[in-house]
C-alpha cells in the first residue's frame, strides 16, 4: 500500500479549507441577499391589506388619513414630492462643493495636510443628525429667511421659487432642509470622489504636464475625465443617504395644511419623517400598514438609487 506523501496530504487539506471558506463566503453573501428579500416581503405583506382598504389613489393622492380602519385614505404624492425635491436640492448643492474639495485635497495640497483636511471632512459624517436638525432650525433658518424672500419676490414666476404651503418666516421649508441635507451628504460624496481622483494614472498627469499644461488644465484634461463615473456614483450614494434621512428633516420641516406644488418653499413630510412622526401610534394593523406602504415605496426608491450607483461605479472609472 502506497502512503500519501506529506505534500499530497497538505494539498488535500488546503483544498478542503478552500472549499470550506468558499462555502462560508457564499453563505455570508446569501445572508445579505436574503435579508433584503425578507425586508421587502415583510413590508409588502404588511402593506397589502391597507392598500386594499385604501379609498384614495396611493400614487396620486396628497391625502394621508389613517384615523380608522374604515376611513383609510392615503397617498404618497406629497411625501414623494418633498423627499425627492429636498434630496435633489441637497445633491445640486453638495456635488460641486465635494468635487472642489476632492480636487483640492488630491491635486493642490501636500500629502500631510491632505490627510489632516480629509480627516476633518470625514469627521463631519460623525455628527449626529439631530445636531444638524437643531442647527438648521435655530441657526440656518433665520439666516436663510432674507434669501428665501428675495428668491420668492424676484424668481417667483419659476415654480421652484413660488410661494409654498408654509410661511417663509419660520424657515421650515424644503429649501432649508435641502441645505442641511447637502452638508450631511458632503462627506460621502467628497470621500468617494477623493479616492477616485487619487487613482488618476500618473502617466496621464505627466503627459499633460509635458505638453505645458497648467495645474488647472491638468485637472480639466486628466483628473476630472478619469473620475467622471466615480463622481456620478458618489452623487448617487449621497442621494440615497439624503432620501432616507429622518430626524434632521423631521425637526426642520413644518407640517402643511394643504398640498405642495413642487416649490422649494413648501413644507410637509418626507417618507421617513412621516413614518417617524407617527411611530408612537402604530397599534392598529390597517393604519400601521398605511405607513408601512409608504416605507415600502421609500425602500424601493432607495434600492433603485443604490443599484444605479453600483452600476455606475462598476463601469469604467473614466466613464
Curated annotation (Swiss-Prot):
The keyword Transmembrane applies. InterPro entries: MetI-like, MetI-like_sf, Phosphate_PstC, Phosphate_Transport_Permease. CDD domains: TM_PBP2 (cd06261). One of its GO terms (molecular function) is phosphate transmembrane transporter activity. Keywords: Cell membrane, Membrane, Phosphate transport, Transmembrane, Transmembrane helix, Transport. It is a multi-pass membrane protein. The keyword Nuclease does not apply. GO terms for cellular component: plasma membrane. Pfam families: BPD_transp_1. The chain crosses the membrane at residues 25-45, 84-104, 120-140, 141-161, 169-189, 233-253, 289-309. SUPFAM superfamilies: MetI-like. Part of a binding-protein-dependent transport system for phosphate; probably responsible for the translocation of the substrate across the membrane. Belongs to the binding-protein-dependent transport system permease family. CysTW subfamily. This is Phosphate transport system permease protein PstC. It comes from Mycobacterium leprae (strain TN).
Amino acid at each position: 500500500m502506497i502512503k500519501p506523501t506529506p505534500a499530497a496530504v497538505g494539498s488535500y487539506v488546503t483544498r478542503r479549507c478552500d472549499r470550506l471558506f468558499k462555502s462560508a463566503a457564499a453563505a455570508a453573501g446569501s445572508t445579505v441577499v436574503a435579508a433584503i428579500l425578507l425586508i421587502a416581503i415583510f413590508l409588502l405583506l404588511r402593506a397589502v391589506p391597507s392598500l386594499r382598504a385604501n379609498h384614495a389613489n396611493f400614487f396620486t393622492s396628497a391625502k394621508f388619513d389613517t384615523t380608522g380602519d374604515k376611513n383609510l385614505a392615503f397617498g404618497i404624492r406629497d411625501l414623494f414630492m418633498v423627499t425627492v425635491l429636498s434630496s435633489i436640492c441637497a445633491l445640486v448643492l453638495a456635488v460641486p462643493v465635494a468635487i472642489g474639495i476632492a480636487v483640492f485635497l488630491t491635486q493642490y495640497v501636500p500629502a500631510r495636510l491632505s490627510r489632516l483636511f480629509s480627516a476633518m471632512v470625514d469627521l463631519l459624517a460623525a455628527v449626529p443628525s439631530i445636531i444638524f436638525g437643531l442647527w438648521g432650525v435655530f441657526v440656518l433658518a433665520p439666516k436663510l429667511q432674507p434669501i428665501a424672500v428675495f428668491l420668492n419676490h424676484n424668481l417667483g414666476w419659476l415654480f421652484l421659487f413660488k410661494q409654498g404651503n408654509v410661511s417663509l418666516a419660520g424657515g421650515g421649508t424644503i429649501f432649508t432642509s435641502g441645505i442641511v441635507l447637502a452638508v450631511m451628504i458632503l462627506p460621502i460624496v467628497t470621500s468617494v470622489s477623493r479616492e477616485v481622483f487619487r487613482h488618476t494614472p500618473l502617466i496621464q498627469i505627466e503627459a499633460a504636464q509635458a505638453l505645458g499644461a497648467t495645474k488647472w488644465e491638468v485637472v480639466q484634461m486628466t483628473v476630472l475625465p478619469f473620475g467622471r463615473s466615480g463622481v456620478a456614483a458618489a452623487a448617487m450614494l449621497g442621494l440615497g443617504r439624503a432620501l432616507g434621512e429622518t430626524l434632521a428633516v423631521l425637526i426642520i420641516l413644518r407640517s402643511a395644511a394643504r398640498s405642495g406644488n413642487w416649490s422649494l418653499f413648501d413644507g410637509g413630510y418626507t417618507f421617513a419623517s412621516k413614518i417617524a412622526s407617527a411611530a408612537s401610534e402604530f397599534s392598529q394593523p390597517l393604519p400601521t400598514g398605511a405607513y408601512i406602504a409608504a416605507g415600502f415605496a421609500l425602500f424601493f426608491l432607495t434600492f433603485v438609487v443604490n443599484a444605479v450607483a453600483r452600476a455606475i461605479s462598476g463601469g469604467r472609472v473614466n466613464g
